Amino acid sequence: MALPRPSEAVPQDKVCYPPESSPQNLAAYYTPFPSYGHYRNSLATVEEDFQPFRQLEAAASAAPAMPPFPFRMAPPLLSPGLGLQREPLYDLPWYSKLPPWYPIPHVPREVPPFLSSSHEYAGASSEDLGHQIIGGDNESGPCCGPDTLIPPPPADASLLPEGLRTSQLLPCSPSKQSEDGPKPSNQEGKSPARFQFTEEDLHFVLYGVTPSLEHPASLHHAISGLLVPPDSSGSDSLPQTLDKDSLQLPEGLCLMQTVFGEVPHFGVFCSSFIAKGVRFGPFQGKVVNASEVKTYGDNSVMWEIFEDGHLSHFIDGKGGTGNWMSYVNCARFPKEQNLVAVQCQGHIFYESCKEIHQNQELLVWYGDCYEKFLDIPVSLQVTEPGKQPSGPSEESAEGYRCERCGKVFTYKYYRDKHLKYTPCVDKGDRKFPCSLCKRSFEKRDRLRIHILHVHEKHRPHKCSTCGKCFSQSSSLNKHMRVHSGDRPYQCVYCTKRFTASSILRTHIRQHSGEKPFKCKYCGKSFASHAAHDSHVRRSHKEDDGCSCSICGKIFSDQETFYSHMKFHEDY
């Protein structure tokens, strides 16, 4: 097919621009590029056809220097790796007329006031914008051809807000920038053109939103705390247990140090846009059996794994056993949550429940469908007005009730312990009951150990310092902390430390005011079992009806009395 000469008019599709699609109402305004068949035909002509271009070059050289274009900013463009958001711009009639390689502008949900009120930006032509920002054959950089999209601005420290500029950034891959910083592309020593950007403009260029006091949700900051600036020594102040190689941070995520109160910790932040529905994982860590979990231990980075609706085991990401997912902090309330914990085939995954923008922290919590399944306390659930909160039916106004015997416990921990070691849950699997008390066991050897240690007072483990004996080696190890001074259990409310978790548990009740042990005679409550028993022995000795009619001994509780009576029955 013969190509027309440059002087001939080339038929093109007529483009109709609606009156509401003016540059003042759109964040990005471009006119379609003409067909490049003219330029291909011009290059095939003789030398005389270039005379008009040489005259134009001479006129441009004689003209005075053109000052920098007085625009404030250019609208950001989507990079090829990001998903396109459907905006009202794409519904315009002229959008379908654009060539397939045309760079698609990103239109924010609302146009900032500084764009709609700027006459310089509204009057700028598309060719000027393309020459100043997009490129072209000039000194500012290489030209971006039709088959390439404009890359997003680099996450350089000089472009970040002041709060994030002083933070400690751990990228997932080594930086490709030179240590000396960016160098001007002009080889003649001329400084490149500089533009004055306000903080409002900078947020719009980098994130596509404008921070304002009316919309605090659009601000990007460390939600779980304040960003910690690096120390004067220049070190990154990383803990000894943090192994950068084992973190395996995905592309687009980074690790920053934040502080909440006076306690510094780490958080995972987003360095590039993350769409809704992206899944990370699985969560890695040490497999811990349910019987090995300490009730008042550090279980902050531990997830429950369920099989057939029952708790199977835990995955503990504490220390160096976990990957980067163990540094994702929990959300304080549902509105700041952007990740949902999902269990799939015995593994825990984090899935984004909303769009996560650059420099936002990743915050995880359970999904709505997992609250009841994973036994989250009712106080953490959000109940809509007019609806009753969903909670465990076994919890009454008094506490947690045993369905077999009717006993009520103040805490679920004690009710579960009661169900574990009493015949109330005997479904045929506990075939070995103790003849001296009411406890029953699944295996014969467990019953033998129980009788040996509890009833016969067998204490084979002796302390070499004080001579005290214990039935189990673990009890001896806990006792040795008294002599060595080791106190590994610290109170979270004060600075006191203790040798055993049971002592810490009793101490914490002084701060919380909890008194789970209630006297059945007078109704007085106590924080520890020892204080309760001491009160019964001192105040209700005469009122206690649990007295042995054979030897005259008096017992404070019925279980001890029944165990004592077994000895008289056997003899």
UniProtKB/Swiss-Prot annotation:
Domain topic, free-text comment: The first 5 zinc fingers, but not the last one, are required for DNA-binding and transcriptional activity.
Ranges annotated as C2H2-type zinc finger: 400-424, 432-455, 461-483, 489-511, 517-540, 546-568
One GO CC term on file: nucleus
BP-aspect Gene Ontology terms: cell fate specification; cell morphogenesis; embryo implantation; fertilization; fibroblast growth factor receptor signaling pathway; germ cell development; germ-line stem cell population maintenance; homeostasis of number of cells within a tissue
Region spans: Disordered: 129-191
Enzyme class: transferase
InterPro entries for this protein: PRDM14_PR-SET (IPR044408), SET_dom (IPR001214), SET_dom_sf (IPR046341), Zinc_finger (IPR050331), Znf_C2H2_sf (IPR036236), Znf_C2H2_type (IPR013087)
Identification of the protein by name: PR domain zinc finger protein 14
Protein family (similarity comment): Belongs to the class V-like SAM-binding methyltransferase superfamily.
Superkingdom to which the source organism belongs: Eukaryota
Renumbered residue ranges of the record's region Interaction with CBFA2T2: 194-384
